[in-house]
Amino acid sequence: MTRLILATRNAGKITELRAILADAGLPHDLVGADAYPHIPDVKETGVTFAENALLKAHALAEATGLPAVADDSGLCVDVLNGAPGIFSARWAGRHGDDQANLDLLLAQIADIADEHRGAHFACAAALALPDGTERVVEGQLKGTLRHAPAGTGGFGYDPILQPEGETRTCAELTAEEKNAISHRGKAFRALVPVVRELLG
């Protein structure tokens, strides 16, 4: 069984990706980057989600000699011309401070009417092999931004995005419900046939 590295140390994301890939029937040994603590984090210097996902996947594949999967994802707000976008995790200045990011974004759009609060989560999922082979696929989840957070599930901006056709935020959905419709779920399900094609 081929070992496949997930290029993240984010425990929430590792759990989510393992569930998505297992549900898609991917028969590979999946481990997070935390299994390789000597490998430094990769600077996300790309200007798109796809570029950042590829940077991370290639760095891990090169460092471990194993196939690596990475994603880059974020929230794109229509009225902010797609921001925070690739800066979603560090929108408030410090990387990974979910509450500060939520608070800042909600303050920035506080006076925006409901009909102009459209947004989507975007995800680029990349597979990189040690020989340099690469593939990228993308997924989106469209919705509307709530005026206040709701729900305790998920992570990041999940408490404020209400998916189209839903009455609940992503943070109010069960993990299974969220994975079925999420940007990350769509991207990684699209990556499964690519993994099968390249790794057998």
Curated annotation (Swiss-Prot):
<protein>
    <recommendedName>
        <fullName>dITP/XTP pyrophosphatase</fullName>
        <ecNumber>3.6.1.66</ecNumber>
    </recommendedName>
</protein>
<dbReference type="GO" id="GO:0005829">
    <property type="term" value="C:cytosol"/>
</dbReference>
<dbReference type="GO" id="GO:0000166">
    <property type="term" value="F:nucleotide binding"/>
</dbReference>
<dbReference type="GO" id="GO:0035870">
    <property type="term" value="F:dITP diphosphatase activity"/>
</dbReference>
<feature type="binding site">
    <location>
        <begin position="8"/>
        <end position="13"/>
    </location>
    <ligand>
        <name>substrate</name>
    </ligand>
</feature>
<dbReference type="InterPro" id="IPR002637">
    <property type="entry name" value="RdgB/HAM1"/>
</dbReference>
<comment type="function">
    <text>Pyrophosphatase that catalyzes the hydrolysis of nucleoside triphosphates to their monophosphate derivatives, with a high preference for the non-canonical purine nucleotides XTP (xanthosine triphosphate), dITP (deoxyinosine triphosphate) and ITP. Seems to function as a house-cleaning enzyme that removes non-canonical purine nucleotides from the nucleotide pool, thus preventing their incorporation into DNA/RNA and avoiding chromosomal lesions.</text>
</comment>
<dbReference type="GO" id="GO:0047429">
    <property type="term" value="F:nucleoside triphosphate diphosphatase activity"/>
</dbReference>
<dbReference type="InterPro" id="IPR029001">
    <property type="entry name" value="ITPase-like_fam"/>
</dbReference>
<feature type="binding site">
    <location>
        <position position="73"/>
    </location>
    <ligand>
        <name>substrate</name>
    </ligand>
</feature>
<keyword id="KW-0546">Nucleotide metabolism</keyword>
<dbReference type="GO" id="GO:0046872">
    <property type="term" value="F:metal ion binding"/>
</dbReference>
<feature type="binding site">
    <location>
        <begin position="155"/>
        <end position="158"/>
    </location>
    <ligand>
        <name>substrate</name>
    </ligand>
</feature>
<dbReference type="GO" id="GO:0005737">
    <property type="term" value="C:cytoplasm"/>
</dbReference>
<dbReference type="GO" id="GO:0009117">
    <property type="term" value="P:nucleotide metabolic process"/>
</dbReference>
<dbReference type="GO" id="GO:0009143">
    <property type="term" value="P:nucleoside triphosphate catabolic process"/>
</dbReference>
<feature type="active site" description="Proton acceptor">
    <location>
        <position position="72"/>
    </location>
</feature>
<feature type="binding site">
    <location>
        <position position="178"/>
    </location>
    <ligand>
        <name>substrate</name>
    </ligand>
</feature>
<comment type="similarity">
    <text>Belongs to the HAM1 NTPase family.</text>
</comment>
<keyword id="KW-0547">Nucleotide-binding</keyword>
<keyword id="KW-0479">Metal-binding</keyword>
<keyword id="KW-0460">Magnesium</keyword>
<feature type="binding site">
    <location>
        <position position="72"/>
    </location>
    <ligand>
        <name>Mg(2+)</name>
    </ligand>
</feature>
<comment type="subunit">
    <text>Homodimer.</text>
</comment>
<dbReference type="InterPro" id="IPR020922">
    <property type="entry name" value="dITP/XTP_pyrophosphatase"/>
</dbReference>
<feature type="binding site">
    <location>
        <begin position="183"/>
        <end position="184"/>
    </location>
    <ligand>
        <name>substrate</name>
    </ligand>
</feature>
<dbReference type="Pfam" id="PF01725">
    <property type="entry name" value="Ham1p_like"/>
</dbReference>
<dbReference type="GO" id="GO:0036222">
    <property type="term" value="F:XTP diphosphatase activity"/>
</dbReference>
<dbReference type="GO" id="GO:0036220">
    <property type="term" value="F:ITP diphosphatase activity"/>
</dbReference>
<dbReference type="GO" id="GO:0009146">
    <property type="term" value="P:purine nucleoside triphosphate catabolic process"/>
</dbReference>
<keyword id="KW-0378">Hydrolase</keyword>
<dbReference type="GO" id="GO:0017111">
    <property type="term" value="F:ribonucleoside triphosphate phosphatase activity"/>
</dbReference>
